Amino acid sequence: MGINFDVSRPKARSSINMTTKFHTIGLIGKPHHPGTNQTLKRLHHWLTVQGYEVLVEERVASELGTNIIAVDLLEIGARCDLAIVVGGDGNMLGAARVLARFDVGVIGVNRGNLGFLTDLPPDAFEEALAKVLDGEFDTEHRFLLEAEVYRHGMLKASNTAVNEAVLHPGKIAHMIEFEVYIDNQFMYSQRADGMIVSTPTGSTAYALSAGGAILTPNLQALILVPMFPHTLSCRPIVVDACSTIKMVVSPENGENLEVSCDGHVHLAVLPGDEIIVRRSSEQLRLIHPKGHNYFHVLRSKLGWGSKLF
């Protein structure tokens, strides 16, 4: 069972509506997950029959059989008009940090738990996806964060995050000390288990669990949520998305720390380091079925009460 690694573009079949925005579609999913593999196989067959060129992310391509065009995420971003991520929000976040570098629309099929970012049902995606491919969809742009670690004035590490950048102890949970500055203005010193700097997208994730407010996706704002602060009056604070957040780690911290980006990428932090978190120039272009309602999603996922009358 070999994989066809030929990435040449076949001619579009006549069944494609040539006025559509999408011609080349990428499939991405969680490797070695039976439910995800089943959905990916159905998607690949369904899209191929309709004449779309389908590229499959190489980590899952070998599990889908033969006659698969396997490529990496960077090539999906560069070549595809639409990327379909099958999995949960974690899979979406991992793909989004790469795909945000490109002008590619991203839509999700939910094979996870809550699925705030994955709209399509795994067992009945065809009807909704067909409408999207025919041009009936809403587009939403979500901005990313850029996190940088400086040591003695030199950049040591950096990465991006869709949800949040979190300063926290490296291995064992314990109190750490640091100062927080907003646009170089001192805000406070903090003794806590860490600090979450979240986008509106991430406000329904780790930040929400830590007591932060939900920010609607269209807000140009960041929320800073201290983790178990030792001052009861310390509360989450919302700042402008154009703000630069600086956290200076006390030299007295005896343990090495980390900055986590979406819980996937970890940047090493030493006592005395400075962490800069700011809005990235990259944006994720999310595709939703027409009529997508954010408050309906919140109500459904969080179990909020339905209309009374």
From Swiss-Prot:
InterPro entries: ATP-NAD_kinase_N, ATP-NAD_kinase_PpnK-typ_C, NAD/diacylglycerol_kinase_sf, NADK. It is found in: Cytoplasm. One of its GO terms (cellular component) is cytoplasm. It catalyses: NAD(+) + ATP = ADP + NADP(+) + H(+). The active site is at D89 (proton acceptor). Its main location: cytoplasm. Keywords: ATP-binding, Cytoplasm, Kinase, NAD, NADP, Nucleotide-binding, Transferase. Its EC number is 2.7.1.23. Pfam families: NAD_kinase, NAD_kinase_C. Its cofactor is a divalent metal cation. GO terms for molecular function: ATP binding; metal ion binding; NAD binding; NAD+ kinase activity. It is an enzyme of class 2 (transferase). One of its GO terms (biological process) is NAD metabolic process. NAD(+) binds at D89, G90, N163, E164, H174, R191, D193, T204, A205, Y206, A207, L208, S209. The keyword Iron-sulfur does not apply. Belongs to the NAD kinase family. HAMAP family: NAD_kinase. Involved in the regulation of the intracellular balance of NAD and NADP, and is a key enzyme in the biosynthesis of NADP. Catalyzes specifically the phosphorylation on 2'-hydroxyl of the adenosine moiety of NAD to yield NADP. This is NAD kinase. It comes from Shewanella sp. (strain ANA-3).
